[in-house]
Amino acid sequence: GVNLTELMREHLGRPVTGLNDADAAGLAEVAFGAAKDVPGTIIVTTLGTGIGSAVIVDGTLVPNTELGHLEIDGYDAESRASAGQRTAQDLSWKKWAKRLQRYYSHVEMLFSPDLFVVGGGVSRKHEKYLPLLDLKTPIVPAQLLNTAGIVGAAYQASRARAS
């Protein structure tokens, strides 16, 4: 594999930091959004064509968790529960919420998080599916919506520059 961060650093001759889009969104929601000032383990998911994830423990990112690839009922979770699958399979909000319930219950069992934050484009319609979920962990919609990725990337870059 190629270390893209190192390659860019060498080419540009400047400090470079990198992270994936879900990790960037997670950092933004913890620093400035729905999970601001919430202690403990925060799991931010981005529901889109797949399922992105960010795990932040007491403000520290655990990078590249890729929780959309967990196996649920013999399937890759995002192949059953992503927002893209809801559209592709023409699932009602109720049927899709059942799939989300299996996914979030599994993640909850593995991590015992203090908060779930749900992002991605479909989070704008959170009232259609979040109330249908029955979890021990509070689950809330993202606040930063489509700006979360760029806000999180800028935040990470500023933190890297300061250190």
Predicted regions span which residues?
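ATP-binding/phosphotransfer module of carbohydrate and carboxylate kinases, centering on a glycine-rich
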Residues: 6-14, 28-44, 55-163
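Extracytoplasmic strand-loop-helix segments at the start of, or within, the mature domains
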Residues: 51
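Active-site-adjacent loop/helix segments that line or gate small-molecule/cofactor pockets in enzymes
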Residues: 22-26
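General beta-strand structural signal in soluble alpha/beta enzymes
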Residues: 16-21
